[in-house]
Curated annotation (Swiss-Prot):
GO terms for molecular function: ATP binding; ATP hydrolysis activity; magnesium ion binding; phosphatidylserine floppase activity. Its main location: membrane. CDD domains: P-type_ATPase_APLT_Dnf-like. Disruption phenotype: Reduces the amount of toxins sulfacetamide (SFA) and fumonisin B1 (FB1) secreted from cells. Decreases cell population growth, conidia formation, conidial germination rate. Abolishes microsclerotia formation and severely disrupts melanin production. Decreases virulence in cotton and thale cress. It comes from Verticillium dahliae (strain VdLs.17 / ATCC MYA-4575 / FGSC 10137). The gene is DRS2. This is Phospholipid-transporting ATPase DRS2. ATP binds at residues 625-627, 720, 761, 763, 766, 784, 817-818, 898-900, 991, 997, 1021-1022.
Length: 1376
């Protein structure tokens, strides 16, 4: 079809087109894959970038992606024998068949002129002729039923071991690490006979001339070897079309196509355990703990109990597994809601309601207005004339304008279920692929004279993800289901994302492991020295004295194991489960935030991936879709300028019309317009203006059943619908349409306008004209379009041009979409002469018909009289301008990536305050790579040359279209383009494809490695962008939920992004950072005292604390403070974080979790451990003698030292707490109370079991000792005194920015900003009056389609038949 992706032209004819098969996709000459598979392109690009290969980026612009030009007609496309084949291809005459399409009797079809070759076997005679339909045969199959059909249509399928690249490839796919969904391994069809397999003897593969195809040289292929598992790859010659039997469910079931089940869940029963364990042990800390647990099992080497590591590790994994299962259960619930949606499927001669999951390939379904399509469907018939229907693809490509699809004339009459049940035949469809806008198939129908083969193309394909609009119902046959639908083929498996904090955490863990190694080596060397130097003096310890190299090595190994286990808790095992729980609760807080709840459609925020919450506080780039994300998809006719006079639906008091210097300025309301239409000098202009709005369009009126009911307009463009509604509001109501006339009602009188010709809109012309014979008999040309093309076609006698231009500037400054309206009268002779030229152009055969039509249109579109201009508001979502302004204040760069045209995107940029009046627009809109490079280089040179003198980077905004972006994303130009884009405050990319959206995100991610990227969108076309970014946010609510279901967080409105980032993001980042640092601190403090003790116990490896007391340190005694800090701490209130968005930069700069901060916490922990151990040693020096004369002993001293350590780390938690709540009181002082109570119980019960005999009698002695209580509080105060002094000095003499805000919060200091903002708004209004904008957009959004075909097909004056069809569309006397 139209538009070829950038992949180069078709190469020379090849006799070996299909070389190999990998992952069920054909590979083409030269080993290059089809450029249409987004997944493969993204993976190839990522691999090339990582390997450093200098290859161009596979970028496909929006226009190339969907086809911007007119559809090209293939000369062979309408002939029988398969799509794209000529009739001669079905005979033995190959003279007319080019080499790429035919080799040795095989036919190939080039899918929609896009180089995506699909092999079509010419031995279709092996398939049984479908006689009558399955239902007409009484539910029986010819030849023995389904089993026989299955044997006859044997399919050479991949085995479980060979699909997806062998056993390991299959396992990777099942674990979600392969190239797509685990369910997306597609079966390959093979037309074979008699159960013959690939290469079996079912039938001969020779062509009709009896010449065998040339044999390929067999070469060894590791991919074929499969490591000894399964069988080799299937022969590519087995590829054939998908055969779908009409009204024959058993025959289709025998083919075992994938079902219509769609899953976005991360796990299933089989994959949960291996995938979960693989993900968990990709974390360095978990591998470390597993290794330590293994060392503890070595008898005689571990100084602690052998289960003190493995049990906490299992507990951590269990908690993580529970969290993962809960989150995956939510995904499964969302999938179940979709899979259990209701659809109407033909069963027998009636439509029965069933679940989407039960819809199968070959089913005939009925879809009604406003319903989404349950699968990929080929349109058979609709309620509209000529089999037309409107669909909305906003969830696929982001476009809100309706697309027109049309059924084949041969099937468009099948409007009743009984007619459909008698439909017999088969479809030969291309294999599933990811191209949204191409499709080739043939439909073979049973007719009275035999079979009739009809070509199918994208005009008949209705995709899953699209929605039926403005059409009561359609009938269609399902061709692709589930993960084989084009929507799901364009989706990618959700990647496992690692946060910046998590990566830094792994680095810190490695650092602590390094410290652990150093401590272990120091202790081991100390032990060896003590054994050698002091061995005789301490012979009573019976220590071995290694005297040989082997003995030394053995002792060294044993000591290293001992000390590794002893110091292993420097890495807190509870940290990771604590962080998991903290992040999980952050997700709950996001979900439960009523400020982000959208009550209009009962949609709360939903954090689907809580692992990423802290990165919400570190975002530097936001990539946003426009349609449905920034806007509401609702067009409203707001203002009009007619004959130099402005009219509006609502007129503010300060803008009401007044007379100044004899000139009327300001706005009139619509009431005044109706008065002027009757008795004002501008009445003729008003009449033609409103008549143009009511007639020059492609809108179809739909009347209600009741007489006098409100007319509903079916508009392919929301702009046109708004204009026609506006005309109706002003008294010119469009009522009916005939193929050659339109009818409007004015003042109760019906007027007929005879349609003579249509000059269609396209993106080059930027205008649309209709030629009517008006009710007064005069022929007039009505034209509407962009001001740039209308104004240059005006005659000299136009008195209102200047006033209209002024009004256009005002509309553009308000972000409204504008159109200019003009007309001219044409004599009968001039029209007849022109019409001959136009008819000749319309019948031109060849590729230049569109050009000839444009030339013919130019001949009559001149000397116009300007009637006025319209202003349409593409209403933004509530709060969008304020949100974008706040994000920019927070130093977040906002890039808008949209499929809309450049003018529309700029308009929206102005409306949402992404672009401001002070900004200088840098526009790149080139047609070649060289021109794009030259444009970018000149702009960069100009910026760098000016420096800080005349150009402020804050005033620059970049606007680039899809074609230029294609060139800019090439490898040799991408860095230069990114340098220019980074210099700009705002970037708008127009006419971009879904693939380009993802590539732009990948480009920024590649070069801005330290930046966090967030992508937000609402449609399926945004999924690849969402998954490419560090954080994906989906807009849920009005449209489909594909983006929301694939995102990490979903919200209902764009404005909620402000609180999500500035409040929840900032809180999460600060909380997670504080939780991690505190967890490291508390463990280092405790276990460094153990290290200092090794110098006292002659490096014997003895422990200072009882084993289970050590274990319970992280599990019970210090588990609550990190949770309180991580879940409840608020370093700044939500109100002030919103008021001062500049605070957000702290997360961008990673102020709370950089290496410097970690070192400070580490040194602080070491300092505390030294104070605690040294003073504890001094207090208990020589074993303190108790009141009863007994010596305290080793275990009593260790337990006494444990108390001040615990009190110190809990006191530190109190010092770093920003706001105290009752939960902080429970968590921090409460934890100390827990220890005092627990140690009393444990010290009493454990020795009695006996479980810990060394604790016998210790607790009574400790609790009765005043030295114990004095030491506990005195040492804690001594340690924390330095911390308190440092905190005081920091706030008083070197405060951070947030310290000032905390003071404002504490003392409730009033802010002057509200008054300042009011003053700034007043200044902006003054500037808007003083300055006129040059950028204006025009309000056409429909695709470049054939409007004439629509206008000349409808006759709304006819009544509908029994099934809602037009009575004129059914042959007379035909039954139902």
């Amino acid at each position: 079809m139209a538009g070829r992706p950038t992949g180069g032209p078709q190469g020379a004819p090849s006799h070996d087109l299909l070389l190999d098969l990998e992952n069920d996709q054909p590979v083409y000459g030269g080993g290059q894959r089809s450029t249409l598979n987004d997944d493969d392109l993204m993976r190839t690009y990522t691999r090339d970038q990582e390997s450093g290969q200098d290859q161009g980026r596979p970028s496909v612009s929006y226009d190339d992606f969907i086809g911007a030009g007119q559809s090209r007609q293939h000369g062979t496309g309408s002939q029988p024998g398969g799509p794209g084949q000529s009739s001669s291809s079905n005979n033995n005459n190959n003279n007319n068949v080019s080499a790429p399409y035919s080799r040795s009797g095989r036919q190939y079809s080039q899918t929609s002129d896009l180089g995506n070759y699909q092999r079509y076997a010419d031995d279709f005679d092996d398939y049984p002729a479908d006689g009558d339909s399955f239902y007409q045969q009484g539910g029986a199959l010819n030849g023995g039923g389904a089993d026989a059909a299955a044997r006859h249509n044997a399919r050479n399928r991949n085995s479980v071991l060979t699909m997806g690249g062998g056993f390991f490839g299959k396992m990777k796919n099942r674990l979600g690490m392969g190239q797509g969904y685990s369910e997306m391994d597609l079966p390959l069809t093979e037309p074979g006979g008699g159960g013959g397999g690939a290469g079996g003897g079912g039938h001969s593969r020779a062509d009709s001339s009896g010449i065998d195809p040339p044999k390929r040289d067999k070469k060894f292929d590791m991919g074929n070897f499969k490591f000894g598992f399964g069988r080799s790859k299937p022969d590519p010659s087995t590829l054939g079309p998908r055969i779908i039997h009409l009204n024959n469910p058993p025959a289709n079931a025998a083919n075992k196509y994938v079902n219509n089940h769609v899953s976005t869940a991360k796990y299933n029963i089989a994959t949960f355990l291996p995938k979960f364990l693989l993900e968990q042990f990709s974390k360095i800390a978990n591998v470390f703990f597993l290794f330590t647990a293994a060392l503890q099992q070595i008898p005689g080497l571990s100084p602690t109990n052998r289960f003190t590591t493995i049990i906490p590790l299992v507990a951590v994994l269990m908690v993580s597994a529970g969290k993962e299962l809960v989150e995956d259960y939510r995904r499964k619930q969302a999938d179940a809601a979709l899979n259990t949606s209701r659809a109407q499927v033909l069963r027998g001669s009636t439509f029965e309601e069933t679940k989407w999951i039960n819809v199968a390939v070959g089913d005939i379904v009925r879809v009604e207005s406003e319903e989404p399509f349950p699968a990929d469907i080929v349109l058979l018939a609709s309620s509209e004339p000529e089999g037309l229907c409107y669909i909305e693809t906003a969830n696929l490509d982001g476009e809100t304008n309706l697309k027109i699809k049309q059924a084949l004339p041969e099937t468009s009459q099948m409007v009743s279920s009984s007619e459909l049940s008698r439909l017999g035949g088969r479809m030969k469809s291309e294999q599933p692929n990811s191209s949204l806008y191409t499709y080739e198939a043939t439909l073979t129908m049973q007719t009275g004279g035999g079979e009739k083969e009809l070509p199918l193309n994208p005009e008949q394909l209705l995709l899953r993800g699209a929605t039926l609009r403005n059409t009561p119902w359609i009938h269609g046959v399902v061709v692709f289901t589930g993960h084989e639908t084009k929507l799901m083929r364009n989706a990618t498996a959700a990647p496992i994302k690692r946060t910046k904090v998590e990566k830094k955490l792994n680095t810190l863990v490695l650092l602590l492991v390094g410290i652990l190694m150093v401590l272990s080596i120091i202790s081991t060397v100390g032990d060896l020295i003590i054994r050698r130097v002091e061995g005789d003096a301490i012979s009573y310890l019976m220590l071995d004295q290694p005297d040989t190299a082997g003995k030394i090595a053995e002792t060294f190994f044993k000591d290293m194991v001992t000390y590794w286990v002893l110091f292993s808790s420097l890495v807190p095992i509870s940290l990771f489960v604590t962080v998991e729980m903290v992040k999980y609760w952050h997700g709950i807080l996001i979900n439960d935030d009523l400020d982000m709840y959208y009550d209009r459609n009962d949609t709360p925020a939903n954090c689907r991936t809580s692992n990423l919450v802290e990165e919400l506080g570190m975002v530097e780039f936001v990539f946003s879709d426009k349609t449905g994300t920034l806007t509401c998809n609702m067009m409203e006719f707001k203002q009009a300028s007619i004959a130099g006079i402005q009219y509006a639906d609502e007129v503010p008091e300060d803008r009401r019309a007044t007379i100044q210097d004899g000139v009327e300025v300001g706005l009139h309301d619509y009431k005044r317009l109706k008065e002027n239409r009757k008795n004002h000098s501008s009445a003729p202009a008003i009449d033609h203006f409103l008549a143009l709005l009511a007639t020059c369009h492609t809108v179809i009126p739909e009347k209600g059943d009741e007489k006098g009911g409100k007319i509903k307009y079916q508009a392919a463009s929301p702009d046109e619908g708004a204009l026609v509604d506006g005309a109706a509001t002003l008294g010119y109501t469009f009522t009916d349409r005939k193929p050659k006339a339109v009818f409007i009602e004015v003042d109760g009188q019906t007027l007929e306008y005879e349609l003579l010709a249509v000059c269609e809109f396209n993106s080059t012309r930027k205008r649309m004209s209709t030629i009517y014979r008006c009710p007064d008999g005069v022929i007039r040309v009505y034209c509407k379009g962009a001001d740039t093309v209308i104004l240059e076609r005006l005659n000299e006698n136009n008195p209102h041009v200047e006033q209209t231009l002024t009004h256009l500037e005002e509309y553009a400054s308000e972000g409204l979409r504008t159109l200019c309206l003009a007309m001219r009268e044409v004599s009968e002779q001039e029209f007849q002469e022109w019409n001959q030229v136009y008819e000749k152009a319309a019948t031109t055969v060849g590729g230049n018909r569109a050009e000839e039509l444009d030339k013919a249109s130019e001949m009559i579109e001149h000397d116009f009289f300007l009637l006025g201009a319209t202003a349409i508001e593409d209403r933004l979502q509530d709060g969008v301008p304020e949100t974008i302004h706040t994000l920019q204040e927070a130093n977040i760069k906002v890039w808008v990536l949209t499929g809309d045209r450049q003018e529309t995107a700029i308009n929206i940029g102005m409306s949402c305050k992404l672009l401001s009046e002070e900004m200088m627009l840098l526009i790149i809109n080139e047609e070649s790579a060289a021109a794009t490079r030259d444009n970018i280089e000149k702009k960069l040179e100009a910026i760098r040359a000016q420096g800080d003198r005349t150009i402020e980077l804050e005033t620059l905004a970049l606007v680039i279209d899809g074609k230029s972006l294609t060139y800019a994303l090439e490898k040799d130009l991408e860095k230069m383009f990114l340098d220019l884009a980074i210099m700009c405050k705002a970037v708008i990319c127009c006419r971009v494809s879904p693939l380009q959206k993802a590539l732009v995100v990948k480009l920024v991610k590649k070069y801005q490695k330290e930046s966090i990227l967030l992508a937000i969108g609402d449609g399926a076309n945004d999924v690849s962008m969402i998954q490419a970014a560090h954080i994906g946010v989906g807009i849920s609510g009005e449209e489909g939920l594909q983006a929301a279901r694939s995102a990490d967080v979903s919200i209902a409105q764009f404005r909620f992004l402000k609180k999500l980032l500035l409040v929840h993001g900032a809180w999460s980042y600060q909380r997670v950072a504080k939780t991690i640092l505190y967890s490291f601190y508390k463990n280092i403090t405790l276990y460094m005292t153990q290290f200092w003790y090794t110098f006292r116990n002659v490096f014997s490896g003895a422990v200072i604390y009882e084993s289970w007391t050590l274990t319970f340190y992280n599990v019970f005694y210090t588990v609550l403070p990190p949770l309180a800090l991580g879940i409840l701490d608020q370093f700044i209130s939500a109100r002030l974080l919103d008021r001062y968005p500049q605070l957000y930069s702290m997360g961008q700069q990673n102020q709370f979790f950089r290496m410097k901060v970690f070192i400070e916490w580490l040194l602080n922990a070491v300092y505390h451990s030294i104070i605690l151990y040294v003073f504890g040693e001094l207090i208990w020096h020589g074993d303190l003698i108790l009141e009863n004369g007994q010596i305290a002993g080793h275990w009593m001293w260790g337990t006494a030292l444990y108390a001040p350590v615990l009190l110190t780390v809990l006191g530190k938690a109190g010092l770093v707490t920003s706001n105290w709540t009752k939960y902080h009181v429970i968590a921090i002082p409460g934890s100390m109370a827990i220890w005092w109570i627990f140690i009393a119980v444990y010290g009493t019960v454990a020795p009695m079991i006996p479980f810990s005999p060394e604790f016998h009698g210790i607790v009574p002695k400790l609790y009765s000792s005043p030295i114990f209580w004095l030491q506990s509080f005195a040492l804690a105060i001594l340690c924390l005194l330095r911390d308190f002094a440092w905190k005081y000095a920091k706030r008083m003499y070197r405060p951070e920015s947030y310290h000032h805000i905390q003071e404002i919060q504490k003392y409730n200091i009033q802010d002057y900003r509200p008054r300042m903002e009011q003053f700034q708004k007043a200044i902006r209004k003054v500037r808007q009056v003083q300055r006129m904008r040059k950028q204006r957009g025009y309000a056409f959004s429909q695709a470049d389609e054939s409007q004439a075909r629509v206008l000349q097909a409808y006759d709304t004056t006819q009544n509908r038949g029994r099934y809602g069809e037009m009575t004129s569309s059914r042959p007379q006397g035909q039954g139902t």
